[in-house]
């Protein structure tokens, strides 16, 4: 049984890698409609870019990937089960359904390609042929050997729940100020999102501090204006 599972996992991984290699990201219609250049088209080299000084810790081990997925799913289930007590007007209500996320190598490849530019902003287009893709980014700086773990940075996103009004659950608001305050949290708990892939890099800043940069891509994308974040369990 273990051999069969291993073979199946390798087959799925190979298929996802083939999808990444086969996709013509420069002709992706979902990018063209917004006059945006896809990250994989704009940055064809997998090598970190010129902004990445003395870079290290590029990408993740399998154990780190599992930890990222598990932390996301732990937080999603906290909300789905009605155990999140924070919010601007009370606890977050439970969800009818909020499936666990799984790691997606194509999303991870695109996230890593963007992280490798060492530019702390969202990329213009990261969609794949299967669906539109959302994104969370985080960066911390340190002067010594201490470094932020991915899970600590994920919690920075999730903790936006303290500013979240549960009346927004049924229809994601169009107010950009709200998106700026809680958009990382809502992407984490967006019920229709099922895939995640992340990239990571550390590099030196001009002031000699070390920047820790995390990019996570999600599909299908959350934060769709007017759409429900999840269905509330009555």
From Swiss-Prot:
Chief location of this protein within or outside the cell: secreted
Record domain SCP: where: 69-218
UniProt entry keywords in alphabetical sequence: Allergen, Disulfide bond, Secreted, Signal
Record family assignment: Belongs to the CRISP family.
Disulfide bridge positions per record: 26-41, 31-125, 52-118, 198-216
Region Disordered, residue ranges: 80-99
Cellular localization per UniProt: Secreted
Keyword Disulfide bond: yes
Native organism: Solenopsis invicta (Red imported fire ant)
Top-rank taxon: Eukaryota
Signal sequence extent: 1-22
Protein name in UniProt: Venom allergen 3
Gene3D superfamilies named in the record: CAP
